[in-house]
Amino acid sequence: MTASPKQRVVVGLSGGVDSAVTAYLLRQQGHEVVGIFMKNWEDDDDGGYCPSGTDFVDAAAVADVIGIEIEHVNFAADYKERVFAEFLREYQAGRTPNPDVLCNAEIKFKAFLDHALRLGAEKIATGHYAGVRRNPASGRFELLKGADPAKDQSYFLHRLDQRQLSRTLFPLGALRKTEVRRLAEDIGLPNARKKDSTGICFIGERPFREFLNRYIGPAPGPIEDDRGRVLGQHSGLSFYTLGQRQGLGIGGLKEQGAQRGGGAHAPWFVARKELATNTLRVVQGHDHPWLLSRALEAQDARWICGAAPAPGRYAAKTRYRQQDASCTMASAGQAGFRLHFSEEQWAVTPGQSAVLYDGNVCLGGGVIAG
């Protein structure tokens, strides 16, 4: 979707190459472009792991080259209240949340959008690899997959609503990452070769367990296999997620003989977290039955068009960058939905998002309950 000529568009400038090219493209189209750098985490809270200062310098350098104004806005209080607090609650409940999904819905397309509108913006834009269009038949706005399958970010945007999409532009939706990099170099953007950010800003480059330990603390308990054999001790169920292979501390233990999809030298995987007994269940072998499921239930559903889709066959993702999985949805509502998959799905994880697609259109999704 493109903006009308000469609209006032506020762009979220992160300091990365994607948002930089986004701002450049909109400027080239003749729009009045203003950049906003969002500070979502206080430096005092992160021990220097979140390089917001460096990122702002990069964003300001980009704004200077493109010839636009940039404003530094602090959303840290909103982030802690709306995103981080929920992040901790989910981990304490034994689930594995995806804070990027909540951050998009609550900060980047709510707090940021509200701020941009106060500045007189008609649209906001970000460097996400996704698309938005208005369906001529229904008049509703639709969220589309990005053209680059390796970078498509519609999964993280599935909780956006009609108000948010109606005000949003995704200029990179039709481009591939290689094209964005090439364009950044061709026009001389100072961050053209900057490495893509990975992970969550408030965790940074530190080990995840080290970070989480500051807020939740250890709660040791037994590690048991699928037959109840005690293999070791875990440091707290919050520090593990389904399908996890590394960091279990039981790598030297091997089953005697092949069993359930794994031989004597097959690796161990986290299969269940039993909160009632504080027990971490592990199994040997990637294709152990405990790691496979044909159905899931999701709660706290959000539907982009405002109403649940009709029962039928769709595609779904239960994690980012997963290939679309064919499924059937028998019924759905605002409270939740249930999916049945054509093929077994691996390590479907409570707390992560189940996102539904009809071809190239993202319909919405919910939080996996089990």
Swiss-Prot record:
The active site is at C103 (nucleophile), C201 (cysteine persulfide intermediate). GO terms for cellular component: cytoplasm. NCBIfam families: PRK00143.1, trmU. Catalyzes the 2-thiolation of uridine at the wobble position (U34) of tRNA, leading to the formation of s(2)U34. It comes from Verminephrobacter eiseniae (strain EF01-2). CDD domains: MnmA_TRMU-like. Its EC number is 2.8.1.13. It catalyses: S-sulfanyl-L-cysteinyl-[protein] + uridine(34) in tRNA + AH2 + ATP = 2-thiouridine(34) in tRNA + L-cysteinyl-[protein] + A + AMP + diphosphate + H(+). ATP binds at G12, L13, S14, G15, G16, V17, D18, S19, M38, G127. Residues 98-100 are annotated as: Interaction with target base in tRNA. This is tRNA-specific 2-thiouridylase MnmA. Keywords: ATP-binding, Cytoplasm, Disulfide bond, Nucleotide-binding, RNA-binding, Transferase, tRNA processing, tRNA-binding. GO terms for molecular function: ATP binding; tRNA binding; tRNA-uridine 2-sulfurtransferase activity. It is found in: Cytoplasm. PANTHER family: MITOCHONDRIAL TRNA-SPECIFIC 2-THIOURIDYLASE 1, TRNA 5-METHYLAMINOMETHYL-2-THIOURIDYLATE -METHYLTRANSFERASE. The record marks H128, Q352 as: Interaction with tRNA.
